Amino acid sequence: AMCETARAMLVGDNLVGRVIARPFLGSNGAYTRTENRRDYAVEPVAETILDRFAQRGLQTVSIGKIEDIFCHRNVGLADHTKNNHDGIEATLKYLQGDEGSFIFTNLVDFDMLYGHRNDVEGYAKALEYFDARLPELIAAMREGDLMILTADHGCDPTYPGTDHTREYIPILALGPAWKGGAPLGTRTTFADIAATAVEYLTGEIWHNGTSFLN
């Protein structure tokens, strides 16, 4: 309720991009963050790729906190999973079904539980867990599917402090019909991923970024 009130107040000259509710349990000196995070964002001020996909009749599936980040606008079928395990399970379910043309998954544990908390061992174990599950995701892909693995920012658990860090993000793109081993180079903008998704699903040129589809 406090964050909802803050979101209603922080508009106009006092506008902030996002109010984040991060509930904790425990007592003084021994608090533990729960998985019941919610993000109260500002509605996007311009067209997003989710808007474009909706206009073209494509179904988006939003897994994790995606629905909150995009302020529930054209997020399609929203599955608000709370951790990496549930996010991977949901992604597998929708890959194997027929609900989505575009499956948009956020796995929050890397950032929330380990990066910001400087938990190197936990981060390593989370990476190992995802690596172990990745073959299942790849096996569930169909001919013509394209999977892009990336991050929205760095969050190095070994770096002093608890804020985001400034590494270049990784981009891995793969699919049954795609030849592997092609270097994508150092991209100039995060928007290249959006441009690639739009070209792949609609054949259209996105107004930001450059597609690396070819």
Regions from the PLM with identified roles:
Residues 1-214:
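Feature captures the catalytic ectodomains and active-site-proximal regions of enzymes
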